[in-house]
Amino acid sequence: MQSWVNKLWYQSHPLRFALWPLTLLFGAVSWLRRLLFSLGLKKATKLPVPVIIVGNITVGGSGKTPTVIYLIELLRSHGFKPGVISRGYGVEIEGVRSVLPEDKPASVGDEPAMIVSRTAVPMVVGAKRVDAAKHLLAEFDVDIIISDDGLQHYQLARDIELIILDGERRLGNGMLLPAGPLREAAWRLKSVDQVIVNGGIAQSGEQAMLLEPSKWLPVSPVHNGSLPPSQSQPLVAMAGIGNPQRFFDTLQALGYCVEQAQAFDDHSAYSETALNELANGRLLAMTEKDAVKCRDFAKDNWWSLAVDAKLSPSFDKQLLAKIDRLVADK
């Protein structure tokens, strides 16, 4: 299914024209909804702390989660106490709930489980981001909120908007859903504080971001000491993210011998049986987001590759300066 959609959105597939009427309808509804908020006919809830939205205008993975982790670490290093809110994609959450280190991705979502596992940040998930943000402020000592996704969730007033763009895919065929991958039209890029480009070539006015591999982590929490992958050792690679090929290309660029590469749909659920069959006793390499879903049944020779987002000092300086102004005005 995902490969078919990729052909439709990122290649010149003729079916996109058949979907044009639905795209017009989607665009009209999206425009009207934004207009109601901009005119004040629908009210956005303002919070007593700065709110940073990390989102995108395309469907699928673009690098939001590594960016959120980068911001958490940046803000902490400058004395802030960040908290994070998220929808918890792919799970049904009644009301809101705090994300705990022991929570399973099936209960809170893949990205929230990974973010809390990596950073131990205070985090709340819920379909209504305003409610999630209020719960976060009530339950935790937080002085700035990062919203993982939620660019189109206009009920929550925001102080800073960051769009993360896949530098290789960019806007695909440039069409709105369902004919293309866009949640909002391309003009939205000009209305945000920063457009962060993950990989590829950043255009004028955009911020370049690199995802740098940092280290191999054992998937199993009771790892028994097997060695991490080496370039001379054949491995099986798997990825269930927005752009699996990016992970496979990274492994090959690092010099690893990828004997087999298996792409899964984003947010796929994994079974012990299926992954045992895939690995067949061989070393299995996966992304951090996949790893949080495999811990309960992982074998000793299953490893995940941690990546760190890297942004320029000028980005950090501009962002922190704006946050300081916001804090002074709150």
UniProtKB/Swiss-Prot annotation:
The entry lists its GO molecular-function terms as:
ATP binding; tetraacyldisaccharide 4'-kinase activity
Residues folding into a coiled coil are: none
Q: Which GO terms describe its cellular component?
A: plasma membrane
Write out the GO biological process terms.
lipid A biosynthetic process; lipopolysaccharide core region biosynthetic process
Keywords annotated in UniProt: ATP-binding, Kinase, Lipid A biosynthesis, Lipid biosynthesis, Lipid metabolism, Nucleotide-binding, Transferase
InterPro entries (alphabetical): LpxK, P-loop_NTPase
SUPFAM superfamilies attached to this UniProt entry: P-loop containing nucleoside triphosphate hydrolases
Record-listed ATP binding positions: 58-65
Q: Cite the annotated pathway.
A: Glycolipid biosynthesis; lipid IV(A) biosynthesis; lipid IV(A) from (3R)-3-hydroxytetradecanoyl-[acyl-carrier-protein] and UDP-N-acetyl-alpha-D-glucosamine: step 6/6
Q: Which reaction does it catalyse?
A: a lipid A disaccharide + ATP = a lipid IVA + ADP + H(+)
| Pfam families documented for this protein | LpxK
Q: What is its EC number?
A: 2.7.1.130
Provide the family line. Answer: Belongs to the LpxK family.
Which HAMAP family does this UniProt record tie to the protein? LpxK
The UniProt function text for this chain reads: Transfers the gamma-phosphate of ATP to the 4'-position of a tetraacyldisaccharide 1-phosphate intermediate (termed DS-1-P) to form tetraacyldisaccharide 1,4'-bis-phosphate (lipid IVA).
Recorded protein name is: Tetraacyldisaccharide 4'-kinase
Natural source organism: Shewanella pealeana (strain ATCC 700345 / ANG-SQ1)
The protein's gene is named lpxK
